[in-house]
Amino acid sequence: NLAVGSHLVCLPGTHSKWVGVRDGRIQRIATAMTGELYAVLRQHSILGRLMPVDDTRFDAFAFDAGLRRSEQAGGMLHHLFGVRTAGLFQQIAEPALPSYLSGLLIGHELRASGAFSQKPRPAQVHLVGNDRLLASYAHALTSLGIGVQRHPEDLAAHGLHALWSRRSATRSNADV
């Protein structure tokens, strides 16, 4: 229940959403193109040529290395070039490169969301989405010492329906 207190909700996907909620009211929304950027880099860049076609295998060690790299100086563009270097010099095995790239991008997304520089830092993030995406985000958040509560992907549709119903009811009452 998000009706009382401050909460942070993440809806990972092609365009991930970060929603700050206080006492049941949306305070802020931030969007990141993490999923789309991952797909573009995998399918249409020199990085994708270094990786296997099938990227369904999750390598926790490589993912964590990407998360750690995202914390370091240099910025995301420099870090992305480092993915190429790691692949060319076999510092990270080819099958693990997609997990490394994913960890790097998600790590940058977490930091860019601004939620983790707040004081106090959120103790928990509500994750809404499919199990595969939630697993990566849950892994990243728990590695940062932040708890997660998972919610099914249809929760977002239910929430939008509730907002629409409330809006429609408000308009109907205003017409009276």
Each language-model region and where it sits:
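Glycine-rich phosphate-binding loop plus the immediately following alpha-helix
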Residues: 1-8, 12, 17-69, 73
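Short active-site-adjacent structural elements
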Residues: 17-19, 114-115, 134-138
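Short hydrophobic/aromatic-enriched beta-strand-loop microsegments
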Residues: 27-32, 144-154
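Conserved active-site and cofactor/substrate-binding residues in soluble primary-metabolism enzymes
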Residues: 32, 36, 75, 97, ...
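Adenine-nucleotide phosphate-binding core of ATP-dependent small-molecule kinases
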Residues: 69-110
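Phosphate/pyrophosphate-binding loops at sites that engage ATP/ADP/AMP, CoA/4′-phosphopantetheine
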Residues: 110-121
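Glycine-rich phosphate-binding loops at beta-strand->alpha-helix junctions
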Residues: 122-140
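Glycine-rich phosphate-binding/hydrolytic loop that grips phosphoryl groups
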Residues: 149-176
